[in-house]
Amino acid sequence: MADKSHQCVIVGIAGASASGKSLIASTLYREVRERVGDENIGVIPEDAYYKDQSHLTMEERVKTNYDHPSAMDHSLLLQHLQMLKAGQAIDLPVYSYVEHTRTQKTIRLEPKKVIILEGILLLTDARLRQEMNFSIFVDTPLDICLMRRMKRDVNERGRSMDSVMAQYQKTVRPMFLQFIEPSKQYADIIVPRGGKNRIAIDILKAKINQFFE
């Protein structure tokens, strides 16, 4: 049964792939959690809402443009945000970067006072923007993002450097220019220099802490 008295604050963090979104989200989560406890703050990665592709062959899956809004199941994400705001728990999807589809597993996420939502395409969807109490765009130069992405995808996601570069040239950069960068206009706060901008993190942390006063 929904808890109508439950108030859930949604903080959106968007920006290019490997811009430092996840670092900012994890830093805010860790430092705010120390003060308010794990039961009051959580993180939802937009990546968890890539569409299920289990009906496709592996050859077809790798051809998907993962930087286009159509690759995301934003309708399910919207439903889950609305459920959390209504005081209902959700089953967060688990996506496999190796298999390029959702797994059969889910993660149970109980309602929290604050949910940090992070992903590249969050601000491109007006429905998601409507659910956010405030939003952040992490503004990092593309050449830095590319270097970070290559290191991450090769070391953590089993990719080759050639495949990472090919994907960057074919879809990542064009989709950033077409969809992600223009969505910066919808952000309440623009954070330069990525996840190591300590001053910006302290300001954001103070803003989030206001919701617990």
Curated annotation (Swiss-Prot):
Enzyme class: transferase
Pathway assigned to this chain's UniProt record: Pyrimidine metabolism; CTP biosynthesis via salvage pathway; CTP from cytidine: step 1/3; Pyrimidine metabolism; UMP biosynthesis via salvage pathway; UMP from uridine: step 1/1
Residues annotated as signal peptide: none
The protein's name: Uridine kinase
Compartmental location: Cytoplasm
Keyword Nucleotide-binding attached: yes
Keyword Transferase: yes
Pfam families, per the entry: PRK (PF00485)
Family named by the database record: Belongs to the uridine kinase family.
Source organism of this protein record: Erwinia tasmaniensis (strain DSM 17950 / CFBP 7177 / CIP 109463 / NCPPB 4357 / Et1/99)
A GO biological-process term: UMP salvage
A GO cellular-component term linked to this record: cytoplasm
Main subcellular location: cytoplasm
Classification via HAMAP family: Uridine_kinase (MF_00551)
UniProt-recorded Gene Ontology molecular function terms: ATP binding; cytidine kinase activity; uridine kinase activity
Entry-linked InterPro entries: P-loop_NTPase (IPR027417), PRK/URK (IPR006083), Uridine_kinase (IPR026008), Uridine_kinase-like (IPR000764)
Keywords, in A-Z order: ATP-binding, Cytoplasm, Kinase, Nucleotide-binding, Transferase
Binding-site list for ATP: 15-22
E.C. code: 2.7.1.48
Reaction equation(s) it catalyzes: uridine + ATP = UMP + ADP + H(+); cytidine + ATP = CMP + ADP + H(+)
